[in-house]
Amino acid sequence: MTAAFPLTLSGVHVRKQGKTVLGPVDLTLATDGTTIIVGPNGSGKTTLLRVMHGIERVNDGQVAWECDDPAKHGFVFQTPIMMRRTVAENLAYPLKLLKTPKEQIAMAVDHWLARIGLEASRNGQATRLSGGERQKLAIARALIRKPDVLFLDEPCANLDGHATREIEALLYEVASAGTRLVMATHDMGQARRLANDLVFLLDGKIHELGPAAIFDRPATGALAAFLRGDIVT
């Protein structure tokens, strides 16, 4: 991770109920590509994503964005869509919050429905979508605002192999088009397929970070043990 991205974490700590769940964390993201955050359950992956996005307060340290415009940051949660609304309404919602003109909203919704293959479902309830379709909708809804960086928390959790491959293809396409991706996953195969850079968290601390090559040449015993499966995920 060499070229600077306009997001730097310095001495960040997050404590909950008197317990440190994240920190100390010092991290500057690379300027482009996809950063994958890995680590066992409870290691702080989701908390780190939330801190980066600005929806988790830190107890100590600084989170410095070069650009503080929230429209430039997108987030896909593990339960991200509004189930009682239609597919089209889900897509339109972020743009309505930004008071985007109706004509532009309609064009953007049409574009993303076509891109994720859900044109026929535009007026159907989100509850009728499959798990993979819901996740594609969630990603499209985050991207419809054209963010510079997109944070994703386990975007393929509980999906079958076919749906996972579809989501990975969409994410690869999005990253190739210039959107910066920062993603937490427990799927090491997925991490290998998508990562340009890797962050390994353990007990709320970054134990190793670097280019994807560290998958094959880990510098720490902790990452080597995690990759072997000796640390339960």
What are these regions (language model features)?
Residues 185-186:
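H-loop/switch region of ABC-family ATPase nucleotide-binding domains
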Residues 203-204:
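Conserved ABC ATPase "signature" C-loop
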Residues 53:
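Helix-to-loop junction immediately C-terminal to a conserved catalytic motif
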Residues 161-163:
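Helix N-cap at the start of a conserved alpha-helix in ABC-type nucleotide-binding domains
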Residues 125-129, 133:
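Conserved ABC ATPase signature
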Residues 103-121:
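Conserved ABC ATPase "signature" region
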Residues 150-153:
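Catalytic Walker B motif of ABC-type/P-loop ATPase nucleotide-binding domains
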